[in-house]
Amino acid sequence: MSNTVYNEGYSGNKNLFFRKGINDTIFTQKRKFIDLGFCSGANLLGHNTDIQKKILKKYIKNNISNFSSPNIYAEELAKIIIKTLPNFSKVIFCNSGSEANIKALRICRAITKKTKVVNVVGSWHGSVDQFLFKTSKKLKVTELSNGLTPDLKKNIIFIPYNDIKSSRKILDKNRKKIACLFIEPIQGCLPNKNSKNYLKFLELYCKKYNIFLVFDEMITGVRTNLRSAQDFFKIKTDISTFGKAFGNGMPIGFIAISSKIKNLIKKKRLHIYFGGTFSGNSLTSFFAKEYLIYLIKNKKKIFNYLNKISSYFEKEINNYCQKNFIPARVYRFFSMIRLIYTSKKINNRSARDFLESLKYKEIKNFRNYILDKNIYYPNNGIIFFSYSSSLKNINYIIKTFKSGLKKFFI
């Protein structure tokens, strides 16, 4: 019998429909799994933790209603965010990363009066019509979805990640038509620490030619030791979008804009619509505010542990693969992790996709093996740990990964 829900992911096995989660474990009707996804990285503390329960009880006890009207909790949350992200002066709330990117793009086009947007190959910006395209190795653009209007394809330009020479050539050819450049500074498809020079190039190029630089930091915001990737790399963007771990499970997205953008909107007297019934709603705002206060107070303890277990996993798997000549390596940026199925050094998704396509059967069998051992390995391949990930379970994950790699890749 087919499933009633038509969203992505619901066409598969109903035995993998989850009903609850506790700390680092998630449950279906019949089985339990150690989680490697944590709601695509959003659940930084884990599932159904004591602090989450405490915050929700406080919300109920104080008789707070879920206002869609302006409320004090959204303002209080915004002030904490600005202290956490010092490069920005204003925050625009919404409910998801996709929505944040839609509105960030709207801001750029409203100010510049230009329509073309640059995306970096390998960056994912959610279910945004303008970004639902992919490229071939030669950067030929094709649609990822039906229902996209022809002008969208005309308005998207792709540049290769971590390739300054090729990116400069494409940008030089189109720079007068470009409103903005979107990029995930650390891509989920390849959490590469070695992108600073490329990101610095983009920052300087965009500044020189008046192209707005937009960082999509859905996966890096908060997880970068309660900072952002741009703060880590010392890059200043015009606009950045955030979500996921800023809500620890609550649906949240927001756009952070610089003083430059704020002043341009005011100077040009632009009316840019940002509304939405639940944008900045009091439930999400109150929860996120209390959660961020908790993170700030316990920053050292939480992030030291996250980095410790993430580094431990990386070293154990990589040392095992090197010692046994297994063509696989772990790539990591703080607690964002991906197992890449090649031992060759790669710098972008195009190289990764080509090399992994040669091992499609082995990868599929390996992932099914991990699932059979009661470890939930997310379909998108991005591994996130949480503060609730126990060392006992991390050791079990490492042991299982090693046995699976030996079984299918030697």
Q: What do the predicted segments below correspond to?
A:
Residues 1-410:
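Conserved N-terminal phosphate-binding loop of PLP-dependent enzymes in the Aspartate aminotransferase
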